[in-house]
Amino acid sequence: MAENKGKFYMTTAIAYTSGKPHIGNTYEIILADAIARYKRAEGYDVYFQTGTDEHGQKIQEKAEAAGISPKEFVDQVSGEVKRIWDLVNSSYDNFVRTTDEDHEKCVKKIFKKLYDQGDIYKGSYEGMYCTPCESFWTESQLVDGKCPDCGREVQPAKEEAYFFKMSKYADRLIDYINTHPDFIQPVSRKNEMMNNFLLPGLQDLCVSRTSFSWGIPVDFDPKHVVYVWLDALTNYITKIGYDPDGSTDQFKKLWPADLHLIGKDIVRFHTIYWPIFLMALDLPLPKQVFGHPWLLQGGDKMSKSKGNVIYADDMVDLFGVDATRYFVLHEMPFENDGVITWDLVIERFNSDLANILGNLVNRTVSMSNKYFGGVVTSTGVTGEVDADLKAVVTATRDRIVEKMAKLRVADAISEVFALFRRCNKYIDETTPWVLAKDEAQKDRLAEVLYNLTESITIGASLLHPFLPETAEKIVAQLSTSLRDFDELNQFGLYPDGTKVTDAPEILFARIDAKEIQPKVDAIQAKQKEEYEKEQKALNGGETADEAVIDMDPKEEITFDDFTKMQFQVGEILSCEAVAKSKKLLCSQVKIGNTVKQIVSGIRKDYTPEEMVGKKVMVLVNLKPAKLAGVLSEGMLLCAEDENGTLSLMTPEKSVPSGAEIC
């Protein structure tokens, strides 16, 4: 067994229970599970916690639309989340729910403690509120008048609230981040937090709400419910035994957390709010917060209305659990967003899982049965190419250790497949089928098959954290077991004389895209049908196309005011993402004989590639202004639906660039 290296407490963000998680949401639990399994193999005593975040205004509104209570709603969604987490073979130790009685009780105590010691005070809040993000913003923080996080519409809000004195701890947090370079990873996330939030100065944080009731009541002022982030973030301590009145031995053993694994969109909450809450509670900070990138559906936003959402259970039905795990782990870069499409999944399945891995195992076991009745023996008859094979195989473990220490999981799994590629090359170099024709080469053939079997055993053991079912199937076919981590840099431990299975199983049979496509079409059609039903329920029996949106009327303008605005048709020549923004695209728009640069907050709904060539409606004579440091010389006209999805306004018929809109 690997030497016990002590505890390793890791968490995912708890999933918000507003709906069924898609594959982009599921990526996080698969990534976390791979890390947890790897750490266990290394010899750590891992405690892996995940769960669901179940309070907030958005959930209350969704429950009302569904005609059920918020608790019934979150019970359904939390159950669905847990089902999917289990489906993808995640080995968590604790699945938490923020509606659990012990959590709610502890949150009340935490709020009271912070209030009693003067870190929380009562006041009132007036600002702009984003319901999906459950966040307040000042006018200056908005981007194009919309939420800087999600790009949706915000609403003015004023209410009595309790506030946390963030500024009291800001300098201390800045010092901590500067002296603990691994605290926020990747480094780009750290720079974003420092430059965009901490260094400009923190405002006090609203930590209670009165405009809705679905939350944990403030004990001493029950018309207030605890703000969702103070509620949700504290699960990392409440569910392992923290108590302001005296914590358990488990808490003392596990805290501080070794790793919070979260999506890049909630880094701010985990690296600013959370550490400041912990400082106020006089608790140590987590050792590392890692903000992983997103998994996007092609170049497009996942949307049920488009039928392009990919769910983990659909992927598992079509490709299997480990193929699903392999794709999301292998295709996600360290910092940049990854891309998933059905075609890419099929391509990766066939090239890597079927050709490289499945074919290797099947050929090796089949040749052992064909030439030696399945008995694998080391004869010591070596060849020139053996040394290089052994060097590659025995060096792989340490290369993986290096990658995993930096949480470069995609690179680590690529190292395992580099080992399998080397094995396939070894088959081509040694040509066992040729050796089998020469009785004098029988011992050499036996050694070749032993080397392959030993290499595959090591590779399967290294693969186990990432594809556990596949790794176990491989060693079962080789009639052995997974190798101890400390032994994975040694060659020759496969027991001499072992008999492999005489009925090798095809691990991954190649997939014909033409056979899969009808199933994908059915999935997409079902999504669109479900979307229409949901919209009909939300819109009082109307379909999405029949639904209407009422807006509060704005101040009337005169005809003269209107004629001051110049609207024309433009053609987008080129488009690129604005480097300093997650929401903005910068387009070069041809309007007649003029080209204008226009910055728009539509990145969540359009990719730069989608924009090129579109005919759009443009407000041409808008006063130029800089957005995220980039000059914008006009405005593209869009419509926004009830879900905040933007659609560019385009002419119905073909009209030339520069045509007047009147």
Task: Provide a role label for each language-model segment.
Residues M1-N4, Y38-D45, A66, P70, ...:
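Secondary-structure transition/capping motifs at alpha-helix termini
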Residues A2-T50, D102-C106, C150, P156-K370, ...:
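Structured secondary-structure scaffolds
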Residues S78-D93:
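A glycine-rich helix N-cap at a beta->alpha junction
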Residues Q117-A170, I174:
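Cys/His-rich short segments
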